[in-house]
């Protein structure tokens, strides 16, 4: 059979694209007649609102906020083949995620790249609502993230906090008292999670190498145009090849670590670097409903990667925003330091002390209200067609929740634009971050798909903020600089200008320059 020329290839591809696009458009048009979808900006055939988002020149979350101001609390965006239904109202979110929780508890189909790294949706966050998800989540929550189990890792957290303080001191000595908050906070959290996940003592070089592997995965998972227009996937074969290469490197690097832990628990006392317990220990022989065998090595890699990536950037980002707010609001920083001194005196803050600090809890809750880790919780989908707010929610829709609209809604909060921890002090405003009694803020999602690591993340944030404020007085860099609270998307919502700050040891001690 004769081969096609380059020109023939082009014509064939263009024709296939046109015919497929026409078929898709006609199918979507026939579908749309069946549903009373929420209103939204009119889009183009085939591509929907993709061009409007691109031409706006704004990040997606800013575009969504603009659309919200025009279309209200529930609206639709057509993003190529995806129908996005976006919720921005607390009552609608509560109705969907709490009152109709089981209906909204599943996930939409993933793009092919994500299924590579989730091992075909075999992770807590990616799994569709069903027996696999229930087995994986139950194991993580009951056997790893319960309050009892978390207490067993107190020494790990204490050690990581000591290393964080020393790291900050060393960095300040080398840089005239200036430190890079996010980088240092992120490494401290990652060290904790690595120890919890693998149950092995590791040197910093190995931890940093694991971190590099995890970052490569996150970068590879950045959205692409073919996520919204799968018809274009053939044009992204190079990117898919790169994703497979990153996955291979991830598996090849992590499997030996997994095997080291397996040998350590099979032969107690044989490995002096092994700790008493780890997340891996709960996974080796895990019985997953509907699955005949225990998780494979590749599935273990995906589950461990989820544990590490899911808990690192969200926590570190919260700490960065928290320190920035303390610098911008020195009265809050002073009051927090006074509470710490009053509670522990001269001794080092530990987790039991943190439980006795109501103002610290108010500060952390306020920073999570003002600066949720992401602008959108992980995408939901419905298990069956349903309605919300008088509109149809079809089974193939992506249900998105725009969290800032809820946390900044004046119907929910007094002076929502102000950073004010006092609102949570006794007699002030209340907020249940789990959303069960009502949704006013949702930094970790709500409902059946709420982040399973919520308790762990809040422990880490409280402890880090307490230790960092106890040890140092935090200031702006340069000193006269006004804090810029503009955010940008980098796996989580980070400060657009990464926070550099000055630190001065408490008690009048000077940082050695």
UniProtKB/Swiss-Prot annotation:
Binding site for heme: 451
GO-annotated molecular function: heme binding; iron ion binding; oxidoreductase activity, acting on paired donors, with incorporation or reduction of molecular oxygen, NAD(P)H as one donor, and incorporation of one atom of oxygen
Record keyword Metal-binding present: yes
Keywords annotated in UniProt: Heme, Iron, Metal-binding, Monooxygenase, Oxidoreductase
E.C. number: 1.14.-.-
Top enzyme category: oxidoreductase
Keyword DNA-binding: no
Example of a GO cellular component annotation carried by this entry: membrane
Cofactor entry: heme
Family membership noted in the UniProt record: Belongs to the cytochrome P450 family.
PANTHER family: CYTOCHROME P450 77A4, CYTOCHROME P450 98A9
Protein name in the entry: Cytochrome P450 77A3
Classification lineage: Eukaryota, Viridiplantae, Streptophyta, Embryophyta, Tracheophyta
UniProt gene name: CYP77A3
């Amino acid at each position: 059979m004769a081969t096609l020329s380059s020109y023939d290839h082009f014509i064939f591809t263009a024709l296939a694209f046109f015919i497929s696009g026409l078929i898709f458009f006609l199918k979507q048009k026939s579908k749309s007649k069946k549903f009373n979808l929420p209103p939204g900006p009119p889009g183009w055939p085939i591509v929907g609102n993709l061009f409007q988002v691109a031409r706006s020149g704004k990040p997606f979350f800013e575009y969504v906020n603009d659309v919200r101001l025009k279309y209200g609390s529930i609206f639709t965006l057509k993003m190529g083949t995806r129908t996005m239904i976006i919720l921005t109202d607390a009552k609608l979110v509560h109705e969907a995620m709490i009152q109709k929780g089981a209906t909204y508890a599943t996930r939409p189909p993933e793009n092919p790249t994500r299924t590579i790294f989730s091992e075909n949706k075999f992770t807590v966050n990616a799994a569709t609502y069903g027996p696999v998800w229930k087995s994986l989540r139950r194991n993580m929550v009951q056997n790893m993230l319960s309050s009892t189990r978390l207490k067993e890792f107190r020494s790990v957290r204490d050690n990581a906090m000591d290393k964080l303080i020393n790291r900050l001191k060393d960095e300040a000595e080398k840089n005239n008292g200036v430190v890079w908050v996010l980088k240092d906070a992120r490494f401290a959290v990652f060290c904790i999670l690595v120890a919890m996940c693998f149950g092995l003592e590791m040197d910093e070089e190995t931890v940093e190498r694991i971190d590099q592997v995890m970052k490569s995965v996150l970068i590879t998972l950045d959205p692409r145009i073919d996520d919204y227009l799968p018809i274009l996937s053939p044009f992204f074969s190079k990117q898919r090849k790169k994703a497979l290469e990153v996955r291979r490197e991830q598996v090849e690097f992590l499997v030996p670590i997994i095997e080291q832990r397996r040998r350590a628990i099979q032969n107690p006392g044989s490995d002096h670097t092994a700790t008493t317990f780890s997340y891996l220990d709960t996974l080796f022989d895990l019985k997953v409903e509907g699955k005949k065998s225990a998780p494979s090595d590749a599935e273990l890699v995906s589950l461990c990667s989820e544990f590490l990536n899911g808990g690192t950037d969200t926590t570190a980002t919260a700490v960065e925003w928290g320190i920035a707010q303390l610098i911008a609001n020195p009265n809050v920083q002073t009051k927090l330091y006074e509470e710490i001194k009053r509670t522990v005196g001269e001794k080092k803050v530990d987790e039991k002390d943190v439980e006795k600090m109501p103002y610290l809890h108010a500060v952390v809750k306020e920073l999570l209200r003002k600066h949720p880790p992401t602008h959108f919780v992980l995408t939901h989908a419905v298990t069956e067609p349903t309605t919300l707010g008088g509109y149809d929610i079809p089974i193939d829709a992506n249900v998105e929740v725009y969290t800032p609209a809820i946390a900044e809604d004046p119907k929910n909060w007094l002076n929502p634009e102000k950073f004010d921890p006092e609102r949570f002090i006794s007699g002030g405003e209340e907020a249940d971050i789990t959303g069960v009694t009502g949704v006013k803020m949702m930094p970790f999602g709500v409902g059946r798909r709420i982040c399973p690591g919520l308790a762990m993340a809040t422990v880490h944030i409280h402890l880090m903020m307490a230790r960092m404020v106890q040890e140092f007085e935090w200031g702006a860099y340069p000193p006269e600089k006004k804090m810029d609270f503009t955010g940008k998307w980098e796996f989580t919502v980070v400060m657009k200008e990464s926070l550099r700050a000055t630190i001065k040891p408490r008690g009048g001690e000077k940082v050695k320059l």
